[in-house]
């Protein structure tokens, strides 16, 4: 039951800029008495990233084919798709390197709900500032390597629960002058290599007797991952439509209010950090 509930939470929150890992930690501690754990979070993210792969299958195939063709064809190397493929590759490096170097902190100390609450509020404010002051004039065809590096670096901050991978990358994209739909779409593409790598590397840790957090059976883990993916697919479709006509202020205020509520719950001892 716990694994299914948390899978739905994962699917609902993975692509919204409100921190899926933060929500998993809050819900699991508040309703089930213990943290779901970084390993469970990482593995269920495979399901949500499969949703991205299915949703953007056409884009992904085009980028992969163009990238391989560009390795041997100078004319192809001048296309935007070839450059975009490199932006995704380079932008995925920061989170991979930092995730490897600081994996013990990610599974342990950084999962304090005090940190989660602070990051929810801080990055909510930063997202609001990016929405308010970002130029939002550059579309998909204006993406650069600088965008890939800086948005990839922002993605790495999501190793801290409460930051939000999509929240960090969308905030960075808006700050760099990208329009909202472009920032969101590139955020999704940027996540695929890093999240799949993290999920695969954590599969064995979920079932270790000494592992921190939830320890589901193999069957429960598979079902939870599928559920997270199905819910996540619906959220992708909704979010892409939403940002076409709406600002991200809804998520800004949600993050700030949730962070304040979390501080209140911690302060009154309703939930343990």
From Swiss-Prot:
Q: Which domain of life is it from?
A: Bacteria
- What cellular-component terms does GO give this entry? plasma membrane
Q: Where in the cell is it found?
A: Cell membrane
EC number(s) per UniProt?
Answer: 3.6.1.27
Q: Where does it primarily localize?
A: membrane
Task: List the GO biological process terms.
Answer: cell wall organization; peptidoglycan biosynthetic process; regulation of cell shape; response to antibiotic
The catalysed reaction is: di-trans,octa-cis-undecaprenyl diphosphate + H2O = di-trans,octa-cis-undecaprenyl phosphate + phosphate + H(+)
Keyword Cell wall biogenesis/degradation: yes or no?
Answer: yes
Protein topology in the membrane: Multi-pass membrane protein
Other known facts: Bacitracin is thought to be involved in the inhibition of peptidoglycan synthesis by sequestering undecaprenyl diphosphate, thereby reducing the pool of lipid carrier available.
PANTHER family per record: UNDECAPRENYL-DIPHOSPHATASE (PTHR30622:SF4)
What is the name of this protein?
Undecaprenyl-diphosphatase
């Amino acid at each position: 039951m716990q694994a299914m509930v948390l899978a739905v939470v994962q699917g609902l929150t993975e692509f919204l800029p409100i921190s899926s890992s933060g929500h998993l930690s809050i819900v699991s501690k508040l309703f089930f008495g213990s943290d779901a754990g970084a390993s469970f979070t990482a593995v269920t993210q495979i399901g949500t990233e499969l949703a991205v792969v299915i949703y953007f299958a056409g884009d992904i195939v085009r980028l992969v084919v163009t990238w391989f063709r560009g390795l041997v064809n100078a004319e192809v190397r001048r296309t935007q798709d070839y450059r975009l493929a490199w932006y995704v590759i380079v932008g995925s490096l920061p989170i991979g390197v930092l995730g490897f170097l600081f994996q013990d902190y990610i599974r342990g100390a950084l999962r304090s709900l005090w940190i989660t609450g602070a990051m929810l509020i801080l990055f909510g404010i930063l997202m609001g500032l990016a929405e308010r002051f970002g130029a939002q004039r550059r579309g998909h065809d204006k993406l650069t390597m600088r965008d890939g590096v800086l948005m990839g670096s922002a993605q790495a901050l999501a190793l801290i629960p409460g930051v939000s991978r999509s929240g960090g990358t969308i905030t960075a994209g808006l700050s760099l002058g990208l329009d909202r739909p472009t920032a969101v779409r590139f955020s999704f593409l940027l996540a695929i290599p890093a999240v799949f790598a993290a999920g695969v590397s954590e599969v064995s840790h979920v079932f270790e007797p000494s592992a921190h957090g939830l320890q589901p059976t193999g069957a429960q883990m598979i079902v939870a991952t599928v559920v997270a993916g199905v819910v996540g697919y619906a959220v992708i479709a909704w979010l892409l439509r939403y940002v076409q006509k709406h600002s991200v202020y809804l998520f800004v205020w949600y993050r700030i209010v949730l962070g304040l509520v979390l501080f209140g719950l911690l302060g009154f001892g309703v939930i343990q950090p």
